[in-house]
Amino acid sequence: MGCLGNQLLIALLLLSASGIYCVQYVTVFYGIPAWRNATVPLFCATKNRDTWGTTQCLPDNGDYSELAINVTEAFDAWDNTVTEQAIEDVWNLFETSIKPCVKLTPLCITMRCNKSETDRWGLTGTPAPTTTQTTTTQASTTPTSPITAKVVNDSDPCIKINNCTGLEQEPMVSCKFNMTGLKRDKKREYNETWYSRDLVCEQNSNETDSKCYMNHCNTSVIQESCDKHYWDAIRFRYCAPPGYALLRCNDSNYSGFAPNCTKVVVSSCTRMMETQTSTWFGFNGTRAENRTYIYWHGRSNRTIISLNKYYNLTMRCRRPGNKTVLPVTIMSGLVFHSQPINERPKQAWCWFGGEWKKAIQEVKETLVKHPRYTGTNKTEQIKLTAPGGGDPEVTFMWTNCRGEFLYCKMNWFLNWVENIQNGSRWTSQNQKERQRRNYVPCHIRQIINTWHKVGKNVYLPPREGDLTCNSTVTSLIAEIDWINGNETNITMSAEVAELYRLELGDYKLVEITPIAFAPTSVKRYTTTGASRNKRGVFVLGFLGFLATAGSAMSAASVTLSAQSRTLLAGIVQQQQQLLDVVKRQQELLRLTVWGAKNLQTRVTAIEKYLKDQAQLNSWGCAFRQVCHTTVPRPNDTLTPNWNNMTWQEWEKQVNFLEANITQSLEEAQIQQEKNTYELQKLNSWDIFGNWFDLTSWIKYIQYGVLIVLGVIGLRIVIYVVQMLARLRQGYRPVFSSPPAYVQQIPIQTGQELPTKEGEEGDGGGRGGNRSWPWQIEYIHFLIRQLIRLLTWLFSSCRDWLLRNCQTLQPVLQSLSRTLQRAREVIRVQIAYLQYGWRYLQEAAQAWWKFVRETLASAWRDLWETLGRVGRGILAIPRRIRQGLELTLL
């Protein structure tokens, strides 16, 4: 029996241990390298010290390094919050830099315009026949010889005098109109000069003047600029708020969409970028390399082509001549600006420098090699073409030159690049367009279609004097059109937003998620409280902990403590740096569009930090890098591979369980707090003074009442049990007998009758022939078996303990003897140490006495010597006096 008991006990212990070990619990890890896509506002940084740079962006310190991480991530230039924010922000910059501020429909009245000018520019009827038109008619009927291409360079004389072949005067019309000014009862005549494209005139009128009006008078959302602002390219970069990061696809084959980019780097800011606003071309971009590459939309034929910077492609624009701008007061507070012309100026124009033909040929060769392209492989069948029609910003190349909006007719340039001098494209052009030149005519407009939103703005006339701007052409905005199987058109596009998809399309914004859950076999143990680690941390930078993003979960978990401290310190450091530059940027208090955006960025950073800390605190995991819990694992089928799986991969698998795990952790923490509260209430019994508290006496009264009620109830239960026991013996109380009840007296043989009346109640239990009822006997049997079982357990345990004690007795005796010998050795050594210590004390005292006496004797001798020397010195005058006296005597 003893051996069997031991075996059962061992088996029970093994089963308990295996059961505890097999149960896995949720463990919270803080500081893991994982992230998810985010859409929070970014803030900008720039080195520009102009008005815009100080009011819109934070100062840029240029210290933004990148860190390579061994992960695979998806990138999309068109479905990208970074590019969308850039497009929206540059539009806001465009609006605030050239700011329309007065909502009105200006000058929607009939004007009297110069009829000769309206006829000349084709506003009223058919233009008068000219030599140019005659030549056009002849050209359409008779073949002409090939036209020699006209190419100009920087040293060409026509550039200096603005007299290159084909350039004409600006198409402008002088008009007069009467309008009520400040005095409503009096009208005043005004003179105004308009671009011909901004006017609509009555056709075939026989009057001396043409009746014209603005062609946008029926547009209700027209705004006039309240002041002339300077617009120029501005370089800036985007930065992520603290707690967020920017991933970049560093693959040279990236073409705007990559579901599995394996070369990923992480940084806190993007590269520098330019504020570009133009159609057809991108200017001064930062993505130009010594190669041509194409970003292609994943679901359409929209492309943005980065040109090879080796060919040094440039565009230089000029607006010659002088203008005089005068204000026209419409009413109080509303002023419209007119531009009377002193002398008819030459029209604006742009010329293109660099090896354009080689660059376009390389674009065609790159297009043929692109995996999305399915057209002809013959580059001579791929043509660079202009759009068919639409807004002026589409049909013309639209750009901004020092705050002025240029619309350039690009037929000459396309004919020159494609070397077109015959064919359908050549014959479809009018005579003026049939030229092959590396420069194009342009015109300036005041009424502009907005490029980001539907609407129109009215801006001030151009500045006086010459306007010149130089730009580097870095990209083409185009759509790839397959005409048929043998021909492909690269059609220039007016999608200004594509420029920023090229600049920032290889970035994506992610939110660092340092909190993760994973199952472990360790259960939370109760502690008195969380203790902070107060050791200093060498801050490696906020993004340093992401270096382990490609490592296995086990390797990353080993460094969680340092990573989490680096993460927290990095977030705080980022916030401090952001706060410092905001303090230096005093103009931020003006809260411009981007100023408010920068302020919102700091608020976002603080919210994220507080959110993470509050979440950890709600789970009881504050200030812990690895926090074990009492929550069982919710899904047994998901088990992490600690050696071959990264934290990012594990997070993707268990993302759907996050809500349930979070709720379970909060419930477990609430229950633990309740248990802690109940346990703390028991601590009040430790202090004897709390026993005499008034609130305690009220509880004592309650306890007393409950005890009295319990005693009364117990007495009632005992009485009922006794009555039932008597009934089981065959007796019933007299007061409860029914009327027809006749008490039966049992006949007892061989015994005397009872002599006392009081013995009648006990006579039923004294007969020799009486026995217990079978229920009572069964209960006694169970009690006897239970007593035997307990006796056997007691004896077995006692024997087992005795055997173990007998087994351990020699070991204990040997241990006792060893301890005794060790005690003797220690006692002897302590005695030696005490004797040596006393000897050292006596030696030190003797040495100190000797030193003291020696120093005292030396001091006395020195003092006597000094005294004698002093007295001798003091006696010198006396000796001299005595000598003199003796001499005189």
UniProtKB/Swiss-Prot annotation:
Record site: Cleavage: R535, G536
Q: Where is the signal peptide?
A: 1-22
Motif YXXV motif: positions: 731-734
Q: Write out the ranges of the annotated region (V3).
A: 317-349
Q: Name one GO molecular function term.
A: structural molecule activity
Q: Mind telling me which InterPro entries this protein's record contains?
A: Gp120_core_sf, GP41-like, HIV1_Gp120
**Sugar-bearing residue positions:** 37, 70, 114, 153, 163, 178, 191, 206, 218, 250, 253, 260, 284, 290, 301, 312, 322, 377, 422, 470, 486, 489, 635, 644, 660
PTM section of the record: Specific enzymatic cleavages in vivo yield mature proteins. Envelope glycoproteins are synthesized as an inactive precursor that is heavily N-glycosylated and processed likely by host cell furin in the Golgi to yield the mature SU and TM proteins. The cleavage site between SU and TM requires the minimal sequence [KR]-X-[KR]-R.
According to the record, the residues making up region (V5) are 485-492
Q: Where is this region: MPER?
A: 681-702
Enumerate the residue ranges of region (V2): 175-217
Q: Cite the record's Low complexity compositional bias ranges.
A: 126-145
**Annotated transmembrane regions:** 705-725
Q: Which residues lie on this side of the membrane: Extracellular?
A: 23-704
Q: Where is this region: V1?
A: 113-174
**Which keywords accompany this UniProt record?**
Apoptosis, Cleavage on pair of basic residues, Coiled coil, Disulfide bond, Fusion of virus membrane with host membrane, Glycoprotein, Host cell membrane, Host endosome, Host membrane, Host-virus interaction, Lipoprotein, Membrane, Palmitate, Signal, Transmembrane, Transmembrane helix, Viral attachment to host cell, Viral envelope protein, Viral penetration into host cytoplasm, Virion, Virus entry into host cell
- Chain residues carrying a lipid of type S-palmitoyl cysteine: C797
Outline the segment boundaries, as ranges, of region: V4: 408-442
Pfam families in alphabetical order: GP120 (PF00516), GP41 (PF00517)
Its GO CC terms are:
host cell endosome membrane; host cell plasma membrane; membrane; viral envelope; virion membrane
User: Which stretch carries the motif Di-leucine internalization motif?
Assistant: 888-889
One BP annotation, GO: membrane fusion involved in viral entry into host cell
Biological role stated in the UniProt entry? The surface protein gp120 (SU) attaches the virus to the host lymphoid cell by binding to the primary receptor CD4. This interaction induces a structural rearrangement creating a high affinity binding site for a chemokine coreceptor like CCR5. This peculiar 2 stage receptor-interaction strategy allows gp120 to maintain the highly conserved coreceptor-binding site in a cryptic conformation, protected from neutralizing antibodies. These changes are transmitted to the transmembrane protein gp41 and are thought to activate its fusogenic potential by unmasking its fusion peptide. Surface protein gp120 (SU) may target the virus to gut-associated lymphoid tissue (GALT) by binding host ITGA4/ITGB7 (alpha-4/beta-7 integrins), a complex that mediates T-cell migration to the GALT. Interaction between gp120 and ITGA4/ITGB7 would allow the virus to enter GALT early in the infection, infecting and killing most of GALT's resting CD4+ T-cells. This T-cell depletion is believed to be the major insult to the host immune system leading to AIDS.
The text the record gives for the protein's domains is:
Some of the most genetically diverse regions of the viral genome are present in Env. They are called variable regions 1 through 5 (V1 through V5).
Q: What is this protein called?
A: Envelope glycoprotein gp160
Provenance organism: Simian immunodeficiency virus (isolate PBj14/BCL-3)
Q: What does UniProt list as this organism's lineage?
A: Viruses, Riboviria, Pararnavirae, Artverviricota, Revtraviricetes
The gene name on file is env
